[in-house]
């Protein structure tokens, strides 16, 4: 199994494209992470919108550059709105990304996420336990936390990518991105990133935005992982703990965009 590495030049090129296109991202995400997700997208130069009412969600999915479906705080009314948005995204050819939060631990969201797979997501982003559960390999995870190493989920990610046509991202100490055939590994980041709620969910929003860019989608999505890990490393170097990490992280994302424009 060959795992390729993403070049810094490719990551920088994708970030330049990201800033040029400034994707409008329709984030149907969980209640816990909305502010952090929006600020992450803004720091990178995208435009976030959190539209959840069923009638509006369908309408907005048609005009957005990309759609994110995150099931972290799933309810039946929210599921109805997400269905409507995904159906409209499919009709409008709007790329959409699925973040199957805790799909291995809870039955209702597992059934819902499996239903959404029939609508062919453009990308799927989860931790190892979530990806393995979605692929039908195992049911696991400790709530939203993984109990598996990312590398162990690569075969499941490849299977899921081939079955759905999606770019699949498995996040962990090393992130792995696959289209079912090629695999790209992204190293970096810091364990402190796991002590702040929302870094994974925010990454899913950036992945969604990258799916709206021209070029090689696998490399574009891998670039999203690279930016987040880069920013995490820079932020940790300036932080004293989780509380000071968040503002430094947002600053680091912003600085990355300034560097590629210089």
From Swiss-Prot:
Gene Ontology MF, one: ATP binding
Required co-factors: Mg(2+)
Domain of life, source organism: Bacteria
Annotated positions binding ATP: 125, 171
One Pfam family of this chain: HK
Pathway membership, UniProt: Cofactor biosynthesis; thiamine diphosphate biosynthesis; 4-methyl-5-(2-phosphoethyl)-thiazole from 5-(2-hydroxyethyl)-4-methylthiazole: step 1/1
Keyword field: ATP-binding, Kinase, Magnesium, Metal-binding, Nucleotide-binding, Thiamine biosynthesis, Transferase
Keyword Nucleotide-binding annotated: yes
Disulfide pairings: none
Signal sequence bounds: none
Top-level EC class as recorded in UniProt: transferase
Binding of substrate, residues: 50, 198
Catalytic activity: 5-(2-hydroxyethyl)-4-methylthiazole + ATP = 4-methyl-5-(2-phosphooxyethyl)-thiazole + ADP + H(+)
Biological process annotations from GO: thiamine biosynthetic process; thiamine diphosphate biosynthetic process
E.C. number(s) listed in UniProt: 2.7.1.50
Biological function: Catalyzes the phosphorylation of the hydroxyl group of 4-methyl-5-beta-hydroxyethylthiazole (THZ).
Family: Belongs to the Thz kinase family.
Protein name in the entry: Hydroxyethylthiazole kinase
């Amino acid at each position: 199994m060959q795992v390729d590495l993403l070049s810094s030049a490719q990551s920088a090129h994708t970030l330049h494209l990201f800033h040029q296109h400034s994707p409008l991202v329709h984030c149907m995400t969980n209640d816990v992470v909305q502010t952090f997700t929006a600020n992450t997208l803004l720091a990178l130069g995208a435009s976030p919108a959190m539209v959840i009412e069923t009638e509006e969600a369908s309408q907005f999915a048609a005009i957005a550059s990309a759609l994110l479906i995150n099931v972290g705080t799933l309810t039946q009314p929210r599921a109805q709105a997400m269905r409507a948005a995904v159906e409209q995204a499919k009709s409008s050819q709007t790329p959409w990304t699925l973040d199957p939060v805790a799909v291995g631990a809870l039955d209702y969201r597992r059934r819902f996420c499996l239903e959404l797979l029939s609508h062919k997501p453009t990308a799927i982003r989860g931790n190892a336990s979530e990806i393995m559960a979605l692929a039908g390999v195992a049911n696991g995870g400790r709530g939203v936390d993984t109990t598996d190493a990312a590398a162990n989920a690569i075969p499941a990610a490849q299977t899921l990518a081939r079955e759905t046509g999606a770019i699949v991202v498995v996040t962990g100490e090393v992130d792995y991105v696959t289209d079912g055939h090629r695999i790209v590994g992204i190293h970096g980041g810091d364990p402190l990133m796991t002590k702040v709620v929302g870094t994974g969910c925010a990454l899913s929003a950036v992945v969604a935005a990258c799916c709206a860019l021209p070029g090689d989608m696998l490399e574009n999505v891998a670039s999203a992982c690279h930016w987040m890990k880069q920013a995490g490393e820079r932020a940790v170097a300036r932080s004293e703990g989780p509380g000071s990490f968040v503002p430094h992280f947002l600053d680091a994302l912003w600085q990355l965009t300034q560097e590629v424009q210089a």
